[in-house]
């Protein structure tokens, strides 16, 4: 059951709401415009608030639904977390879009919401505060994601290793943003 759900989570994660919504509405492909990222922040820049919110919610659901299904199937918390990681991997490397996806922040937030809601709340609050102070989405994500690890280590240690792997993946996907941050070229709102 674990492997079946892991594969299905990856396939669900491979659905890119940013790309699909752009195609449906005649907006530019987010991978080819703006920051080049197929995610909610770039959709905000390219297509406005409505499509950005729809992208955010869709991407979060891609992380949340597989975890909830795994929970209903009786899988352990660690297995649920790994299934969530598979959904995020689908978002990062989508099968349907030549493996060029987003950065995984919203999908990881959805996964975290299913695993341990207080950690998701902490991540969202940290992201909002960091974004408010810096007006930089990538920096907010790089601050918020690792902050969940101590809380998980304390409350849900079974999810710590999968979430640590996910954190490393998200930081790796932001490596260009890190270069731009250090060079003073990162885009702000």
UniProtKB/Swiss-Prot annotation:
It comes from the Bacteria. Its EC number is 2.3.1.275. It is found in: Cell inner membrane. The chain crosses the membrane at residues 1-21, 77-97, 111-131, 151-171. GO terms for molecular function: acyl-phosphate glycerol-3-phosphate acyltransferase activity. Belongs to the PlsY family. Probably interacts with PlsX. HAMAP family: PlsY (MF_01043). Catalyzes the transfer of an acyl group from acyl-phosphate (acyl-PO(4)) to glycerol-3-phosphate (G3P) to form lysophosphatidic acid (LPA). This enzyme utilizes acyl-phosphate as fatty acyl donor, but not acyl-CoA or acyl-ACP. This is Glycerol-3-phosphate acyltransferase. The gene is plsY.
């Amino acid at each position: 059951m674990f492997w079946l759900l892991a594969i299905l989570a990856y396939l669900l994660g491979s659905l890119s709401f940013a790309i699909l919504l752009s195609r449906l509405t005649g907006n530019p492909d987010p991978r080819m415009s703006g920051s080049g990222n197929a995610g909610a922040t770039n959709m905000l820049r390219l297509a406005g608030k409505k499509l950005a919110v729809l992208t955010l919610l869709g991407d979060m659901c891609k992380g949340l639904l597989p975890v909830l299904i795994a929970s209903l199937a009786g899988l352990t918390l660690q297995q649920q977390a790994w299934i969530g990681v598979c959904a995020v991997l689908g978002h990062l490397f989508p099968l349907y879009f030549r493996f060029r996806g987003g950065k995984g922040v919203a999908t990881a937030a959805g996964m975290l919401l299913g695993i341990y809601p207080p950690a998701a709340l902490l991540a969202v609050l940290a992201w909002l505060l960091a974004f408010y102070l810096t007006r930089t989405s990538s920096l907010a994500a790089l601050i918020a994601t690792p902050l969940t690890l101590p809380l998980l280590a304390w409350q849900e240690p079974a999810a710590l290793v999968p979430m640590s792997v996910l954190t490393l993946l998200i930081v790796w996907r932001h490596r260009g943003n890190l270069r731009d941050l250090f060079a003073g070229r990162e885009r702000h709102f």
